[in-house]
Every structure is written in structure tokens, then in C-alpha cells.
């Protein structure tokens, strides 16, 4: 009899928190990561993102830099008080040297300029998850909890 070894990719999808005040960007990024087998969790602003991280397991955050109330970096600072290892990808329309410096000091995995390239985002998501949690099964058929494996 074959013994099963359970890993995160075998038993559940990674939850990707996508926070952007632009609904179109937020939903498009959600569709991109969902098509790859991840579970998107959408937030329209930083305070909502913090609340989500307080109440459910999140494995990676994709944060818009410029949002009302809290910037992406301010949001990251707050969510890291809850989950100190949470990897983050920052998206921005203005990737200045100063912003890059701030992101580096905040241990952001990567800064992605807008408009975002879906392939680049997916590659960075997989790399950030892999660096934090170990190798990631990139197959879009990752089963959700309770679903049979193919």
C-alpha cells in the first residue's frame, strides 16, 4: 500500500491576499492567481487587508502601493505584526528609487510596475511562496480542501 505524504500543495491551495483600491486591477489579479490554482482573497484597502489577515490564513500578499488611508508598505507593516513571515509583492504605477529602497527595507519580495504583466506576477508569486514555504506545485489542478486528487 502506498503511503501518502501530505504537503500544503496536496491538501490545500495557498491563499493569496490581493489588495488594490482599483476594483478592475484587484479582480484581474484574482482571476490570474485563481487560474493557476491559488485561492485569491480580495481587499479594497489596507484596513480590510489587515482585518482579513487577522481572521484567516494568508500565505502571500500582493499590495498596491498607493491606496486611500494606508499605503501598501503601511499595510505590510501592520499585517507583519500578525504574520511576521508573510511574503509580499508590491505593485505600483511609480517605481521610484526611493520606493525601491523602502520596499527593500520592508523585506518586500518584489516590486512590480503597473500595468502588471500576468506572467511576471505568477512567476513572482510562485517564487515568493517557494522561498517562504518550500517548493510550490505549479499545476493549476491543485485540489481544494476535500477534493479528490487527480
Segments (PLM) and residue ranges:
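Two-component/phosphorelay signaling modules centered on CheY-like receiver
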Residues: 23-41
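Receiver (REC) domain active-site loop signature in two-component systems and cognate sites
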Residues: 67
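C-terminal output helix
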Residues: 98, 116-126
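Alpha4 helix (beta4-alpha4-beta5 surface) of REC/receiver domains from two-component response regulators
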Residues: 74, 95-111
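Acidic catalytic/metal-coordinating carboxylates
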Residues: 44-48, 71-74
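Short amphipathic alpha-helix used as the core "switch/output" element in two-component signaling
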Residues: 51, 73-85
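Active-site beta3 strand of CheY-like receiver
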Residues: 56-62
Amino acid at each position: 500500500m502506498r503511503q501518502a505524504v501530505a504537503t500544503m500543495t496536496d491538501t490545500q491551495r495557498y491563499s493569496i491576499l490581493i489588495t488594490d483600491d482599483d476594483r478592475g486591477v484587484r479582480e484581474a489579479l484574482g482571476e490570474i492567481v485563481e487560474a493557476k490554482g491559488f485561492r485569491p482573497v480580495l481587499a479594497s484597502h489596507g484596513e480590510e487587508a489587515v482585518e482579513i489577515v487577522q481572521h484567516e490564513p494568508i500565505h502571500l500578499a500582493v499590495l498596491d502601493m498607493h491606496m486611500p488611508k494606508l499605503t501598501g508598505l503601511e499595510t505590510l507593516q501592520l499585517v507583519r505584526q500578525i504574520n511576521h513571515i508573510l511574503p509580499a509583492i508590491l505593485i505600483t504605477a511609480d517605481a521610484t528609487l526611493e520606493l525601491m529602497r523602502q520596499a527593500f527595507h520592508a523585506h518586500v519580495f518584489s516590486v512590480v510596475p503597473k500595468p502588471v504583466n500576468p506572467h511576471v506576477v505568477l512567476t513572482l508569486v510562485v517564487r515568493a511562496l517557494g522561498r517562504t514555504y518550500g517548493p510550490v506545485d505549479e499545476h493549476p489542478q491543485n485540489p481544494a480542501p476535500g477534493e479528490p486528487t487527480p
